[in-house]
Regions:
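N-terminal Rossmann-like dinucleotide-binding module
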Residues: 1-49, 172
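Glycine-centered tight turns that cap/initiate beta-strands
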Residues: 28, 66, 144-147, 180
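Short, Asp-centered acidic motifs that coordinate Mg2+ and/or phosphate
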Residues: 33, 53, 69, 93, ...
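Conserved SAM-binding strand-loop segment of SAM-dependent methyltransferases
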Residues: 51-58
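Structural detector of well-ordered beta-strand residues that form the stable sheet scaffold
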Residues: 55, 94-95, 122, 151-152, ...
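Beta-strand-loop-alpha-helix segment that lines the small-molecule cofactor/substrate pocket
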Residues: 64, 68-69, 75-76, 80-128, ...
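Rossmann-like NAD(P)H-binding beta-loop-alpha module
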Residues: 131-151
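Rossmann-like dinucleotide-binding domain that binds NAD(P)(H)
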Residues: 152-200
């Protein structure tokens, strides 16, 4: 008989619901625990998806539950500490939302902890799997549109590099098969949210 993977959701907002829906459609996964600092949010998610155990502290959840997988769908400011704690607790599959963390140093800490404990860390850059991205990648690989030499991406107003810019960077890296970067130029303005400016 195939293994059923025990899943915990950390962060019960919109993306927590999205991840929960996906897990309920996969016969190899079982939602066993959910955590959010907002008690109302975690109870709502647990009721909607029949999740038996609810927590308002991720440390307690990681200590009490034997989880195979966690989805971390919190605000990016706490993803690094939760990822490191999950790896240290023995969780072998960690799915995080984008952006991965609030800084490069935190991202390095996450990777190091997961490598040390043998955990697989995946960041949910779902934009690369769109039909448009897949077709553009095929056209580039086939040489149908020539060899791209420049990528210009304009973000939506107030979208921010940290919030949605990671989709653009990941998408172009995917489409262009991770080419060697020769040089980069960028422009920023002071119209982004304060928390986003602090991370640059």
């Amino acid at each position: 008989m195939a293994k059923t993977y025990r899943v915990g959701i950390i962060g019960c907002g919109g993306m927590g619901h999205s991840h929960s829906r996906a897990y309920t459609k996969n016969p190899a996964t079982e939602l066993v625990a959910a955590m959010d600092i907002n008690e109302g949010s975690v109870k709502t998610l647990a009721e909607e998806f029949s999740i038996p155990a609810v927590y308002t502290d991720y440390r307690q959840m990681l200590e009490k539950e034997e989880l195979d997988i966690v989805s971390i769908t919190t605000w990016q400011g706490v993803r690094a500490e939760i990822t490191v704690a999950a790896a240290n607790a023995g969780v072998k599959g960690i799915l995080g939302e984008k952006p991965m963390s609030a800084s490069l140093g935190e991202a390095d800490d996450m990777i190091e902890a997961c490598e040390k404990k043998g955990a697989k860390l995946v960041i949910g850059h779902n934009g690369r799997f769109s039909a448009t991205s897949t077709e553009i990648r095929r056209l580039v690989a086939d040489g149908a549109i020539g060899q791209p030499t420049l990528v210009h991406h304009r973000a939506k107003p107030n979208a921010g590099l940290l919030n949605t810019g990671t989709h653009a960077i990941d998408g172009w890296r995917y489409i262009l098969s991770d080419p060697e970067t020769l040089w980069v130029i960028g422009q920023t303005s002071r119209t982004t949210d304060r928390w986003e400016r602090r991370t640059m």
